Amino acid sequence: LGVTMLWICPMYKSPLADNGYDISDYYDMLEDYGTMEDVDALIAEAKKRNIGILMDLVINHTSDEHAWFQEALKDPNSKYRNYYIFKKGVDGHAPTNWRSVFGGSVWEKVGNEETYYFHAFAKKQPDLNWENPEMRKDIYKMINWWLDKGISGFRVDAINFIKKDQRWCD
C-alpha cells in the first residue's frame, strides 16, 4: 500500500467527554486502546516497516479530571492554579462576555469562590495557561517523553487557541 505514516487520534487516558480530546493523563493510555506496552510494540513494529507514528496532541486544554486541574481546584495556592486560567468575577458575573466554541460562556464558576476558570471548548476542558513558563516546561517534558519513546511527531489540535488576549476585554 505504500503506507509511510500512521496518524493516531487521541488515545491518551480520558473520561471521553469529547472523544478523547479531554486528556486526563498524557502518560497513560485509554484502556480501550490497550496498554503502554501495546504502544511500545506498535512503535517497534511500525519502525521495522519504515512506518512512522503521528499522534494527535491536545495542549490547549486538559480534562477537568487531569491531576493538575484537580489540584488547582482543591488548593487556590497550589502552583497548578496558575497552570490554568482563573479570574475573579466582576460584580457577580463572569470576567468577560466571551463565548465558547461549543456555546455558552467560556467561564465556569469555581464552587464557593468568586473565581471562574476559562474553557474555550466544553466546561470539562479547562484551558492551560500558556503564559506560565512552568506549565510550558511540563508540556515540553511530556512531548519529549513521547518522542523518546519513538513516535515520529504530532498533529497538534486547537493550536490556534493557546494564545489568549491578555486584556480580557468584552
Label each PLM-derived region with a short phrase.
Residues 1-140, 144, 148, 159-170:
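Acidic/aromatic-lined carbohydrate-recognition and catalytic surfaces
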Residues 152:
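Receiver (REC) domain switch/active-site residues of two-component response regulators
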